[in-house]
Curated annotation (Swiss-Prot):
Keywords: Ribonucleoprotein, Ribosomal protein. This is Small ribosomal subunit protein eS24. HAMAP family: Ribosomal_eS24 (MF_00545). One of its GO terms (molecular function) is structural constituent of ribosome. The gene is rps24e. GO terms for cellular component: ribonucleoprotein complex; ribosome. SUPFAM superfamilies: Ribosomal proteins S24e, L23 and L15e. InterPro entries: Nucleotide-bd_a/b_plait_sf, Ribosomal_eS24, Ribosomal_uL23/eL15/eS24_sf. GO terms for biological process: translation. Belongs to the eukaryotic ribosomal protein eS24 family. It comes from Methanosarcina barkeri (strain Fusaro / DSM 804).
Amino acid sequence: MDIRILKDKNNALLNRRELDFIVKYEGSTPSRNDVRNKLAAMLNAPLELVVVQRLKTEYGMQEGKGYAKIYENADRMKDVELEYVLKRNVAPGMETEGEEA
């Protein structure tokens, strides 16, 4: 899997970086969690502060376009992001103890 950043914008108002990217892959579409891990490693960002908002692929293409956000702190992320988006970005089996799967 190869990720190329198309646009990297700093949003000071919301304390986050906003990224437009293209992910190229072979085989099946990579999971949201795989893309999060790769982005965090590429940009030296803490994994828990990376949110993949969108990942779209076209039929028959081995690439997808995506939009991700990297927050400066977890409190700001929880204030801004919707709950279902945060749940999408948690790896299976990593939910907190108080939540049900």
